[in-house]
Amino acid sequence: MNLEVKKIDTANARLSAKPSIENLEKRYDKIAQKIAQKVKIDGFRRGKVPLSLVKTRYQAQIEQDAQEEMIQEVLKNAFKELGIENKDLIGSPNLTKFEKKDTHFEIEADIGLKPTIVLDKIKECVPSVGVEIPNEEKINERLKQLAKDYAKFVDTDAQRKAQNDDKLTIDFEGFIDNAPFEGGKAENFNLILGSKQMLEDFEKALLGMQAGEEKEFPLIFPSGYHAEHLAGKEALFKVKLHQIQVREALEINDELAKIVLANEENATLKLLKERVEGQLFLENKARLYNEELKEKLIENLDEKIVFDLPKTIIEQEMDLLFRNALYSMQAEEVKSLQESQEKAKEKRESFRNDATKSVKITFIIDALAKEEKIGVHDNEVFQTLYYEAMMTGQNPENLIEQYRKNNMLAAVKMAMIEDRVLAYLLDKNLPKEQQEILEKMRPNAQKTQAG
């Protein structure tokens, strides 16, 4: 077969082979026989179709199957010479050359191998961490917000004019070009003015209305509105206000603590303050990590953890980044790239550094996650996407299905694992007293979030 293999480094190998034409042709009869057992041709019983007829009718398929079989044999022999197995591979080998000559084929392929990653310098990569401890002023602000959020809405006098923070019960219907539109109508709809639950201009139009009042007003949907069929269009809304309710103020005392910490025995204002302080600490930590330290940690990992990267995976990542970039390009730029192979190649090459860094960090994170037994369940991925859908006004099931169809669920899971691994490394580098705050707060992290 005239096979040559070369181990370039610990993560890359290359093969070159020249199998003969006979090597391919000897496979034809066996493949044709397999096809003959399955196909149905008029005038012949299944399995009784003459081989000559099968070869004529299915020539292209036989040729393709024979080539694939021959390539797999080449790869199998190459793996044997390299002393590797399928479990050592990362991704599929990349066929870079397949040419038919007079007497043989010329085949070349790049083989990506799972890299060897040494994590002995991880501690050097983690930046120093110091989270701001919430002061009394911040704690009191959050207590006031909790008192507001947990306050009940009660009826008010009929003469009251609607103000921000009032709870309104309304009927509304929207029209575009005198015709109602999908999603533009609701009855007995509850809305807290100023909450940005609806478009800002919609809520502003309700200010000053009284119970029983009806009103019509124009509204232009923003050009970037999530419902594309409404984006940039002018609508006329008809609204009837049924009821106005106001918050019944709560005192900041032990009674408030019992409401907020309903699952705690003997909840007191002192305990609530401790919980609020811990929650604010977690929020400060998340802000510091997301805005500064995670990126710094990634840069350090990229710089200090050195190992060979499989070229095949970098090339795949470059393709992905290039394709994604096309979606955000102007039509003229896309056309320019389509018309010039050289420009397209140059543009794709511009993503090499980003692709290399992305692949490297992914391998490091994967190794750390396995070492520290950090993972993400599929249900957590679905919960994350469900929350994203709710925040962007999309149908959760449709969004999840969209991610599934585009094979993006694995990428979401990997991003979540990366976030957890980075947070884990940074948490370990917190001062001892802050680690104690964090440990104390873990079971209670969700209890005192405002809203």
UniProtKB/Swiss-Prot annotation:
Family, according to the entry, reads as follows: Belongs to the FKBP-type PPIase family. Tig subfamily.
* UniProt-recorded name of the protein: Trigger factor
Q: Which domain of life is it from?
A: Bacteria
According to its UniProt entry, this protein's organism is Helicobacter pylori (strain P12)
EC number(s) of the enzyme? Answer: 5.2.1.8
Which Gene3D superfamilies does the annotation name?
Answer: 3.10.50.40, Trigger factor ribosome-binding domain, Trigger factor, C-terminal domain
Per UniProt, the keywords (alphabetical) are:
Cell cycle, Cell division, Chaperone, Cytoplasm, Isomerase, Rotamase
GO terms under cellular component: cytoplasm
This protein's gene is called: tig
Q: Give the UniProt record's GO annotations in the biological process aspect.
A: 'de novo' cotranslational protein folding; cell division; chaperone-mediated protein folding; protein transport; protein unfolding
Where does the UniProt annotation locate this protein? Cytoplasm
GO MF entries: peptidyl-prolyl cis-trans isomerase activity; protein folding chaperone; ribosome binding
**Domain PPIase FKBP-type, residue spans:** 165-250
Checking Pfam families in the record gives: FKBP_C, Trigger_C, Trigger_N
| Keyword Cell membrane recorded | no
HAMAP family the UniProt entry points to: Trigger_factor_Tig
User: What biological function has been recorded for the protein in this entry?
Assistant: Involved in protein export. Acts as a chaperone by maintaining the newly synthesized protein in an open conformation. Functions as a peptidyl-prolyl cis-trans isomerase.
Report the NCBIfam families cross-referenced here: tig
Cell division listed as a keyword: yes
Domains: entry comment: Consists of 3 domains; the N-terminus binds the ribosome, the middle domain has PPIase activity, while the C-terminus has intrinsic chaperone activity on its own.
